[in-house]
Amino acid sequence: MENKKSLLKKLLKTNLLPLAFLGDSVHTLIVRENSLLKDDVKMASYNSFSSSKCKAQNQAFALKQIIDRLNEDELEIVRRARNAKPKHHAKNSTSADYSFATAYEALIGYLYLKEDQDRLIEFLNSSLE
């Protein structure tokens, strides 16, 4: 299996939707892990919390909250991912929210493969607030 750095290099040369796919998985994992840290919560509440935090609207909002803190490389990832043309979008979101959510997920995937844990945690925490 390729290491993270070489995979990142490969993905940056192409469409960023695979990076968003990875970022969505990372985001979902952290959200679910965070929900388990809450005391005495029923399973239905875990699912409800996770579902609410993983919606396109929440991810779009999170990106808008952090956009002023992004460096040039991160802004380029966001720009390219927003301009990507997915074949569909979530039925419960607008195409604008879906576009921003895709950009947020691509950014998370980028930071994960880049192994920039500090930035990754900083930005993931913004989506949990």
Regions found by a protein language model. Give the residues of each.
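Double-stranded RNA-binding/processing signature
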Residues: 1-129
